[in-house]
Amino acid sequence: MISVLFVCLGNICRSPMAEAIFRDLAAKKGLEGKIKADSAGIGGWHIGNPPHEGTQEILRREGISFDGMLARQVSEQDLDDFDYIIAMDAENIGSLRSMAGFKNTSHIKRLLDYVEDSDLADVPDPYYTGNFEEVCQLIKTGCEQLLASIQKEKQL
């Protein structure tokens, strides 16, 4: 099974939103048994907490389930266990590469790296900006392109 880990700073806004949206997209394409998704945060401040209320509100409005999602911190083991590690911004990438040390990091990329015509490289953090709508649109586009890339690469 192909595995995808979405990573943001605290695992309550962007990465759980991406996990939920990606799962929904994969399910709609009949890929539930072929691709699994998870999310984690660089920091451990929110471990055990559900997604931020702003993330929950957007996902509810979109009709996308986030049942059972609780924040967790990314681990070194995750770097080995996941085929794709998808970070939300350059700071997350730096933290993940530092954690990896001398291990291969070619499977660690930013979500918006998959969006060819994006003016942005990073998904902004709505925890600080409150712009959950904009972030949701960026994440949706990124997840659609990521899934298409995985389907092409893995011939799904």
Curated annotation (Swiss-Prot):
Keywords: Hydrolase, Protein phosphatase. The keyword Hydrolase applies. The active site is at 8 (nucleophile), 14, 125 (proton donor). It is an enzyme of class 3 (hydrolase). It catalyses: O-phospho-L-tyrosyl-[protein] + H2O = L-tyrosyl-[protein] + phosphate. It comes from the Bacteria. InterPro entries: LMW_PTPase, Ptyr_pPase, Ptyr_pPase_sf, Tyr_phospatase_low_mol_wt. Optimum pH is 6.0. Efficiently inhibited by Cu(2+) ion, Zn(2+) ion and N-ethylmaleimide, while the addition of Mg(2+), Ca(2+) or Fe(3+) ions has minimal effect. Inhibited in a competitive manner by vanadate. Induction: By ethanol stress. Expression is sigma B-dependent. Its EC number is 3.1.3.48. One of its GO terms (molecular function) is protein tyrosine phosphatase activity. The keyword Ion transport does not apply. SMART domains: LMWPc (SM00226). Belongs to the low molecular weight phosphotyrosine protein phosphatase family. PANTHER family: LOW MOLECULAR WEIGHT PHOSPHOTYROSINE PROTEIN PHOSPHATASE, LOW MOLECULAR WEIGHT PROTEIN TYROSINE PHOSPHATASE. Dephosphorylates the phosphotyrosine-containing proteins. Involved in ethanol stress resistance. This is Low molecular weight protein-tyrosine-phosphatase YfkJ. It comes from Bacillus subtilis (strain 168).
